[in-house]
Amino acid sequence: MTNANVDATPLTTKPSQDGFYMPAEWAAQQAVWMIWPYRPDNWRSAGAYAQATFAKVADAIGAATPVYMGVPKAFLAEAKTVMPSHVTLVEMDSNDCWARDTGPTVVVNDNGECRGVDWGFNAWGGHNGGLYFPWDKDEQVAQQMLKQHGFARYSAPLILEGGSIHVDGEGTCMTSAECLLNANRNPDLTKEQIEDLLRDYLNVKQFIWLQDGVYMDETDGHIDNMCCFARPGEVILHWTDDETDPQYSRSKAAFDVLQNTVDAQGRKLKIHLLPQPGPLYCTEEESKGVTEGTGVPRTAGERLAGSYVNFLITNNRIVFPLLDPATDDIAAQKLQEIFPEYEIVGVPAREILLGGGNIHCITQQIPSGK
């Protein structure tokens, strides 16, 4: 690990030209990044509940992988008292704490060298349905993380959040039209142009387009809350059997796409179904602790986009959200069946869900290379 003062000037080539690609999440990892939550207009009690939850997530990850946490200078002393001692705190400004979406996508080559892709970011929609303003500090997060590791940087001409893509490391990229083709992300680009940019910067060949993500997902249906790869040729889909639930039609449509597609290696997909928790709703008490600001309001009675698919694979561990006593054990058992070689660790994560995401959304892995 270096703390090199890397030139901020981005590379003029593209990862695919240079032999770099985005590895799958199950590839070996040298670190996982998180960011300190503090926005009072998104996190109740100015983030106090969320901070305690983030500490538990960091602890669960830290048993398998070193954890770095970006923290604004004003909160460093507080973070030291809350976070486990093994977490490396890095002074870093941010508008909020979604490391998956503001952090870099680290790409590797066959020699084990790592570089980072720095995507454009507009807070999930900019002035057309975005979740807060401003987002200028978030736009600097990826560059700061890459500097910490001494990785060279590619600057991609595409608004994209890390939670909107999943890859299998063998040429396949899965995403959702609800997000990537949304007019509030890249309105001047066609689907084909977006695919071309993903080929350039992820070095993928085949795309699996699901139409929609999870019902009421304020990110416009991020794929990481809806469906993910378990290993090459296998996916895990957020599911409900209740045909009267608004989620049913979304999951059924996704299932139909997955059942009738092949990956970049020509494989038919094995589909695992992970039951949805709840439905879950924000309570009056939970909404009271959030102040008014530029962030999206947190309203009592609002349905939460809870999903067990929003887990992190990190080295020998799966860290997944505990969201509903009625379904947590079922989710854990299902994950253990899908991942028999992994340790399955659940962390109570409702506080993250109240802020609009979950464990995968607040983490960003740094692959080891080889």
From Swiss-Prot:
This is Putative agmatine deiminase. Disulfide bonds: none annotated. Keywords: Hydrolase. It comes from the Bacteria. It catalyses: agmatine + H2O = N-carbamoylputrescine + NH4(+). Its EC number is 3.5.3.12. GO terms for molecular function: agmatine deiminase activity; protein-arginine deiminase activity. The keyword Hydrolase applies. Pfam families: PAD_porph (PF04371). The keyword Hydrolase applies. The active site is at 361 (amidino-cysteine intermediate). Belongs to the agmatine deiminase family. PANTHER family: AGMATINE DEIMINASE-RELATED. GO terms for biological process: putrescine biosynthetic process.
